[in-house]
């Protein structure tokens, strides 16, 4: 099916492929399985993204990395490698990575899917904090009704290819 849509001011239907990097800089992505580079420490994982998106000034890069690590509560973990972190810490690095370019929108795909309930709640509190304090919109996909009921927000449910806005969720 076809339709019209825009994301953070970019019309998607006939978007010039040259504009995609600019759209991408306005989006942050949080993955279910973290997608961290295992051969780099936390700091270098974040630095890789900044370099890939055009950052050149070393001082600004360091400031930004310190800022996002502080926002997600990992200021002292920059030297650690992903395998040295808990699942919750790895997900916080993933959230930090999503924040690097100060996005207008974060797309979170099952951000609590690989986490225990307590750690899931910590990540949800972090995402709510980011949305409230920084004005970043967050669209999250989840099938976890516990998360939906514990952290109420505007909920959209899909069924048979259609979006149902503000659907009542029955547990």
Walk through the language-model features, giving the residues of each:
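Conserved ABC transporter NBD signature motif
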Residues: 2-11
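ABC ATPase NBD coupling module
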Residues: 12-28, 58-59, 133
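Short coil-to-helix segment of the ABC ATPase nucleotide-binding domain corresponding to the Q-loop/switch region
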Residues: 40-48
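Conserved ABC ATPase signature
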Residues: 81-85, 89
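Hydrophobic anchor residue at the start of the ABC signature
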Residues: 95
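Conserved catalytic motifs of ABC-family nucleotide-binding domains
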Residues: 102
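Catalytic Walker B motif of ABC-type/P-loop ATPase nucleotide-binding domains
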Residues: 106-109
